[in-house]
From Swiss-Prot:
It comes from Bacillus pumilus (strain SAFR-032). Part of the 50S ribosomal subunit. Contacts protein L32. This is Large ribosomal subunit protein bL17. The keyword Ribosomal protein applies. Belongs to the bacterial ribosomal protein bL17 family. The lineage of its organism: Bacteria, Bacillati, Bacillota, Bacilli, Bacillales. InterPro entries: Ribosomal_bL17 (IPR000456), Ribosomal_bL17_CS (IPR047859), Ribosomal_bL17_sf (IPR036373). PROSITE patterns: RIBOSOMAL_L17 (PS01167). GO terms for biological process: translation. One of its GO terms (molecular function) is structural constituent of ribosome. GO terms for cellular component: cytosolic large ribosomal subunit. SUPFAM superfamilies: Prokaryotic ribosomal protein L17.
Length: 120
């Protein structure tokens, strides 16, 4: 399996991708570097596919990866519930391609190429 190391150890990389995946599901749009966005795309697409499957095993697989964060304070809905209830139903007819990456300019501090990744 090909992947990017992103300058981190495997545990740090997995933790960062879990955080970014959870944030993208909650906010549906985040700004990050291009390489992180490209790596995040494959993880998020797999999570949405699990959400579309919707069975108990898929829910447990997604729960093992997604952080336990509150997505909506009024309804007390967490990120996993939002994935299965809102996001997965939105893409019921679509076969992949749930995210869009738009390139931005370089970051001011270090010149890293930035991008916005969002759910379509």
């Amino acid at each position: 399996m090909a992947y990017r190391k992103l300058g981190r150890t495997s545990a740090q990389r997995k933790a960062m991708l879990r955080d970014l995946t959870t944030d993208l599901i909650i906010n549906e749009r985040i700004e990050t570097t291009e390489t992180r966005a490209k790596e995040l795309r494959s993880v998020v697409e797999k999570m949405i596919t699990l959400g579309k499957r919707g069975d108990l095993h898929a829910r447990r697989q997604a729960a093992a990866y997604i952080r336990n964060e509150v997505a909506n304070a009024e309804t007390n809905q967490d990120a996993l519930q939002k994935l299965f209830a809102d996001v997965a139903t939105r893409y019921e007819d679509r076969q992949g391609g749930y995210t869009r990456i738009m390139k931005l300019g370089p970051r001011r501090g270090d010149g890293a190429p930035m991008a916005v990744i969002e759910l379509v």
